[in-house]
Amino acid sequence: QPLMEFSGACEGCGETPYIKLLTQLFGDRMMIANATGCSSIWGGSSPVTPYTTNECGQGPAWSNSLFEDNAEYGYGMYIANRTKRQHLASLVEESLAKNVGSDSLQALLNDWLEHMAEGEGTQQRATKLAAALSEEADEDPLLTKIYEQKDLLVKTSQWIVGGDGWAYDIGFSGIDHVLASG
């Protein structure tokens, strides 16, 4: 299901079909760093938004940056999320090493750890693990810490969106920096 609808963009706009497709593929775990431009007008004009959620209340997270800083802004979002998830992984590793929780919870923690870098199936693994953690989190402070960070169980899909002026001219040095960073 597309998680972008009723954008209010100009008739024939070439940007919206791409974003609609991205939301169909990644929308329930998508983070968008948007450069100021047309997409900030049709994508974030208060009091409405074209983005919506699925039946579980999951949908794209959209944020807008200054025109020239968007590549760095989006890259910063990615790095911050990656760092938080690495910390969560260290907590999961510690809980597995200490044999904390039931066998079924340990199996779910191990499965999450093995697949934490994969987008495919991340929502399903996160849902199962969060449910199991909710039942056992009070039994150990380490499980409580993991459960408190359950929003990080899903691997996000980070997107940096901008127009041609941003990509070819004003924001090029930022794009170059992000690409050079790997």
Model-derived features with residue positions:
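Cofactor-binding active-site loop characterized by glycine-rich and histidine/acidic residues
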Residues: 1-182
